[in-house]
Amino acid sequence: MARRNLLIVLVGLLAAAAPSAMAGQTQVAVAANFTAPAKEVAAAFKDKTGDEAVLSFGASGQFYAQIQQGAPYQVFLSADADRPKAAVDAGLAVADSRFTYAIGKLVLWSKSLDVTKGDETLKANAFAKLSIANPKSAPYGAAAIEAMTKLGVYDAIQPKIVQGNSIAQAFEFVDTGNAELGFVALSQLANVTAGSRWLVPAALYAPIRQDAVLLKTGANDEASKGFLAFLKGPEARAIIEKYGYSLE
């Protein structure tokens, strides 16, 4: 009887362990502006499928350089459309997997100044430091320079600019007071009440189309393909919209 009971317990334990043992995992490179929504999407994906999306955050340009060098990412969520396209063109990504998962919005934010009329704040130039993300590796940084150029203030402000390696660091400079104001992604302010902000008019910068792509390293991985499919679905799209992004 004891042996039979032990057998029943073991069978039960094996059955309980089976789903986790079969669960997949995908390595995802995520543009820093998408940090908070990506965490929510990954949690919802795991709840629904049991598969885990392991997220790494940083600047899109830095990720693309790492992918070119053979970094083991399987999915790439960029802050632009150019780098995922380049990955496809270079044979590093699956050709028909690329799609726009979000369209980003640029914001001028300050914890100490009133920037609700951001164009006037920039033209007045009465501040010491303004932060942006590195325009060479972060699309939001390039958008910030484009906006300032169209406003005719870039040349005057340029000596005051401090650059973060990513949009996350640009946010951190303002958050810690190392810059009085800075250009960040609207998504980064979803849960921030401190300070004031100015939503930069869309006419001042090219649309920030954020594309996702399945890398060749994940071409045969079900968790990687499943994560991208989930990202296109209604649950993920609701999360993305909650953080202020537009959708196609």
How would you describe each model-predicted region?
Residues 5-17:
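Bacterial N-terminal signal peptides
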Residues 23-57, 61-69, 78-81, 85-91, ...:
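Exported/periplasmic ABC-transporter solute-binding proteins
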Residues 96:
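Short active-site loop at a secondary-structure junction
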